[in-house]
Regions:
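Fe(II)/2-oxoglutarate oxygenase catalytic core
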Residues: 1-197, 203-267
């Protein structure tokens, strides 16, 4: 049993937790991802013009939907994470005057993304996309919640390679133009270590640096927070129709959200 502590790199915005996974667990996940089959990552893009760039993202990826693994990861990291988002600056998802206090930590996205970087592969500057959905619990209260991810959970599955650091860059009000982020020096550099978790807010500019030798494997999911919400009448009908004695009813599928002012986004 590992003793786990979270180390703050930039307040709550960036932190690391060593030994979230053991070496054996990491190797098992690499094998599972390889068995699932990697494919070339799609081009990434963003910006107000929504133009895609074909050149920067050269890694491979695979997606495994696994609620039990997502729950396992959440059980390990959640005791070390903020229970609410009170610390986070107000944004479009917060009610004015309340901030993040109405959001409480609830789980990890079950859409687990595995990424594989070979020699000379990288992922230049980008911001992370987020996920959201609406659920309702099939109990006496029939309470509905809006779930939204605000934090990225990235786990390094190996460290027997050179390069591949995660670098964070200075804040920029907008990164609409390429010149806004070129030639920036990183303010934080995270060296990969097997089994270590990196947690960061989605809307912070960072990169996965070029792998110099070897192969780099990482696992990404997202930390979900939820708040009470009122269902649209059409969703209420869906909820009633699909109750079927389940503990919870997924009212909407996962929706992806990307920072519109950033030239790069990351799923």
């Amino acid at each position: 049993m590992f003793h786990r502590e979270r180390q703050l790199i930039d307040g709550e915005r960036i932190s690391i937790i060593p030994n979230i996974l053991s070496a054996d667990e990491c190797q098992q996940l690499i094998a599972r991802a390889e068995e699932s089959g990697f494919k070339l990552s799609p081009p990434s893009g963003g910006g107000h013009g929504r133009t895609h760039r074909e050149d920067p993202r050269t890694n491979e990826y695979t997606v495994i939907n696994d609620q039990s693994l997502a729950d396992k990861l959440f059980k390990r990291v959640s005791p070390l994470l903020p229970p609410t988002l009170e610390w986070m600056a107000d944004n479009a998802y917060f009610t004015k005057g309340i901030g993040g206090r109405e959001w409480s930590i609830v789980g990890c996205v079950d859409r687990l993304r595995f990424y594989k970087y070979k020699k000379d592969e990288e992922y230049p500057e980008h911001m992370d996309g987020s996920y959201s959905r609406t659920i309702t619990y099939n109990n006496e209260l029939q309470q509905s919640y809006k779930q939204h991810s605000f934090l990225t959970l990235l786990i390094y599955l190996n460290d027997d390679f050179q390069g591949g650091e995660t670098k964070f860059f200075p804040d920029k009000q907008h990164c609409r133009f390429l010149r806004d982020i070129e030639n920036k020096q990183p303010v934080h550099v995270i060296k990969p270590k097997q089994g270590m978790a990196l947690i960061n807010i989605h809307n912070i500019l960072h990169e996965g640096s070029k792998v110099q030798s070897g192969i780099k494997y990482v696992l990404r999911t997202d930390i979900l927070y939820q708040k009470i919400t009122e269902l649209h009448p059409k969703l209420e009908k869906y909820s009633q129709k699909n109750s079927n004695n389940n503990d919870k009813i997924i009212v909407t599928e996962w929706e992806k959200h990307f920072e519109p002012s950033c030239k790069m986004y990351h799923d």
